[in-house]
Curated annotation (Swiss-Prot):
Co-factor(s): heme
Source organism (scientific name): Eustoma exaltatum subsp. russellianum
Classification lineage: Eukaryota, Viridiplantae, Streptophyta, Embryophyta, Tracheophyta
UniProt-listed GO biological process terms: anthocyanin-containing compound biosynthetic process
Protein name, as recorded: Flavonoid 3',5'-hydroxylase
Entry's Gene Ontology molecular function annotations: flavonoid 3',5'-hydroxylase activity; heme binding; iron ion binding
C-alpha cells in the first residue's frame, strides 16, 4: 500500500525534531560537563597559571594539590593542563585511559632538540614509535638483551672503579656525576656503536656531561611558546634559541659517531651492534621506514636518558648515604655478609641484598629522575573522577608529589629505606604497576629504559657502596641538597666525595 505524502511529511518532521532535540541534549550535556572541570587555581590574563608555577613547578603543583585535590585543571596560556597528584589519579590516566593519553603534545623540546619529534620519546603512538621501541627492546633494553651485554657493564664499571681508586690514592675528591657519565656513556657506546665514546675521563667526557645536563634542564622548562603558540616565534625566554644551539652540538657529535661507525663496518663482520641491527631492520611490515634522522634521534634518546636519569638517582642516593652514615654502614654490612671482601659486586648479587634494593626504592621515591612525567595529551574528551577532561588537554603526573605524600609515606622528607622492608610496602616495585612508586611512568608510554635504569641504579650503587668507604671533603661543612628543576632532577651542587678502597687493591685494576 502506498504511503501518503502527509505521512512522509510527518515522519520527516519527527526526524528533524529528533535530531534537533539530540543536538540540544548533547550541547547541554557538554556544557554541563564543562562546568565540572576539575578544580584549579584562577590564573592571570593571557598567561593563565604559568606565573604560578615559578622555578620549581613540581613543588608548586604539589602545594596546589593540597588545596584543589588529586586531579586539578589549570589554564596555562591557551592550553588546558590536567595534573594528577595521587596514585589513584595517576592510575586513572595512565592505566584506565592509557590509550587516550598515549600521544605527546607539540613542544619546543621535541621540535628543536629531538629532530622534530623523530625520536622514540616524543613520537606519536604509531608505526614509527612501535618500530623504534621494538628494535630497542630486542637489542638493548629488553630482559634478554640486557643479559647479552652484562660483561660490557662489568668491564666499563671496572674502568670507573680504577679511576676512583686513583683519585682516592692521590687524596683527590671524586666528582660522582662526572665518573658516572663517563662510565655510562661508554657502556652505551660499546653496545650501540662497538666503541668506547671516551677513551678516558676528562675534558671531553665532562663536556658531554654538561651537554646532557643542559638538555635535560632546558627540556623541562615551561616554555611560554608551548602554551601560547601564537607568540612562540618571539622566543621571549630565549629557550628555543638555547635549544637550537645545543642541538647543533649534539648533531655534530652524532654525525661524527655515525660516520666513524660506517667507516669501521668491516671490523664488525659477524658481530653486529645495535646500530647495525637498526639499519638492517629499518623497514617494517606496515611500510614504516627509519631514516638517518630517526636513527640520530634514537641515539640521542639513548645517550641522554641512558646516562642522565640513572646517574642522577645514584648521585642522590650517595648523597643521602653520606648524610645518613648509619644507613651506609648497614648496607656495607649486608654486602660483606653476602659477598665478602675478596671480589667485586656482581649483578647476580642484587637479588640477595634486600636492604640495597630498599635503598634504591627509597632513592626513586624521594628523588625521582623525572619529577613530572613527560607530558601527554588527550586524543578525545573523557571523564576522570567525575570530572570532564576536554579533548586536547595536556596531562602531567606529579611523580614527585606522589613520593612526598604524607598520607602514603610516614615522614616523607626523611630518607628511610626501612619503609620498603615493611609488609605493606615490601612488594612495591618501581616498574610501573604500583602507582605509589612510578619513577619511570606507567602505561604504554612508560620509559623504554625502565629495566636498564633500575638495573644500573642497583648495580652501580651497590658496587660503589661495596667498593669504597665514603666521606665528605674536610672543606665541606654541610652537604648541599638543593635541586634545580629540569626534565631530570639534578643536584644543584654536584656531589664530590673522598673515597677509600675497602677491597684488596688488585680488584680495582681494570
Amino acid at each position: 500500500m502506498a504511503v501518503g505524502n502527509g505521512v512522509l511529511l510527518h515522519i520527516a518532521r519527527s526526524l528533524m525534531l529528533f535530531f534537533h532535540v539530540q543536538k540540544l541534549v548533547q550541547y547541554l550535556w557538554m556544557n554541563s560537563r564543562r562546568h565540572r572541570l576539575p578544580p584549579g587555581p584562577i590564573g592571570w590574563p593571557v598567561l593563565g597559571a604559568l606565573p604560578l608555577l615559578g622555578t620549581m613547578p613540581h613543588v608548586a603543583l604539589a602545594n596546589m594539590a593540597k588545596k584543589y585535590g588529586p586531579v586539578m585543571y589549570l589554564k596555562v596560556g591557551s592550553c588546558g593542563l590536567a595534573v594528577a597528584s595521587t596514585p589513584e589519579a595517576a592510575k586513572a590516566f595512565l592505566k584506565t585511559l592509557d590509550m587516550n593519553f598515549s600521544n605527546r603534545p607539540p613542544n619546543a623540546g621535541a621540535t628543536h632538540l629531538a629532530y622534530n619529534a623523530q625520536d622514540m620519546v616524543f613520537a606519536d603512538y604509531g608505526p614509527r614509535w612501535k618500530l623504534l621501541r621494538k628494535l630497542s627492546n630486542i637489542h638493548i633494553l629488553g630482559g634478554k638483551a640486557l643479559q647479552g651485554w652484562e660483561e660490557v657493564r662489568k668491564k666499563e664499571l671496572g674502568y670507573m672503579l680504577y679511576a676512583m681508586a686513583e683519585s682516592g690514592r692521590h687524596g683527590q675528591p671524586v666528582v660522582v656525576s662526572e665518573m658516572l657519565t663517563y662510565a655510562m656513556a661508554n657502556m652505551l657506546g660499546q653496545v650501540m656503536l662497538s666503541k668506547r665514546v671516551f677513551g678516558s675521563q676528562g675534558s671531553e667526557s665532562n663536556e658531554f656531561k654538561d651537554m646532557v645536563v643542559e638538555l635535560m634542564t632546558v627540556a623541562g622548562y615551561f616554555n611560554i611558546g608551548d602554551f601560547i603558540p601564537s607568540i612562540a616565534w618571539m622566543d621571549l625566554q630565549g629557550i628555543q634559541g638555547g635549544m637550537k644551539r645545543l642541538h647543533k652540538k649534539f648533531d655534530a657529535l652524532l654525525t661524527r659517531l655515525l660516520e666513524e661507525h660506517t667507516a669501521s663496518a668491516h671490523e664488525r663482520k659477524g658481530s653486529p651492534d645495535f646500530l647495525d641491527f637498526v639499519v638492517a631492520n629499518r623497514d617494517n611490515s606496515e611500510g614504516e621506514r627509519l631514516h638517518t634522522v630517526n636513527i640520530k634521534a634514537l641515539l640521542l634518546n639513548m645517550f641522554t636518558a641512558g646516562t642522565d636519569t640513572s646517574s642522577s638517582v645514584i648521585e642522590w642516593a650517595l648523597a643521602e648515604l653520606l648524610k645518613n652514615p648509619i644507613i651506609l654502614k648497614r648496607a656495607q654490612e649486608e654486602m660483606d655478609g653476602v659477598i665478602g671482601r675478596d671480589r667485586r659486586f656482581l649483578e647476580a648479587d642484587i637479588s640477595k641484598l634486600p636492604y640495597l634494593q630498599a635503598i634504591c626504592k627509597e632513592a626513586f621515591r624521594k628523588h625521582p629522575s623525572t619529577p613530572l612525567n613527560l607530558p601527554r595529551i588527550a586524543s578525545q574528551a573523557c571523564e576522570v573522577n567525575g570530572h570532564y577532561i576536554p579533548k586536547g588537554t595536556r596531562l602531567s603526573v606529579n611523580i614527585w608529589a606522589i613520593g612526598r605524600d604524607p598520607s602514603l609515606w610516614e615522614n616523607p622528607n626523611e630518607f628511610n629505606p626501612d619503609r620498603f622492608l615493611e609488609r605493606k610496602n615490601a612488594k612495591i616495585d618501581p616498574r610501573g604497576n604500583d602507582f605509589e612508586l612510578i619513577p619511570f611512568g606507567a602505561g604504554r608510554r612508560i620509559c623504554a629504559g625502565t629495566r636498564l635504569g633500575i638495573l644500573l641504579v642497583e648495580y652501580i650503587l651497590g658496587t660503589l657502596v661495596h667498593s669504597f668507604d665514603w666521606e665528605l671533603p674536610s672543606s665541606v661543612i654541610e652537604l648541599n641538597m638543593d635541586e634545580p628543576f629540569g626534565l631530570a632532577l639534578q643536584k644543584a651542587v654536584p656531589l664530590a666525595a673522598m673515597v677509600t678502597p675497602r677491597l684488596p687493591l688488585h680488584i680495582y685494576c681494570p
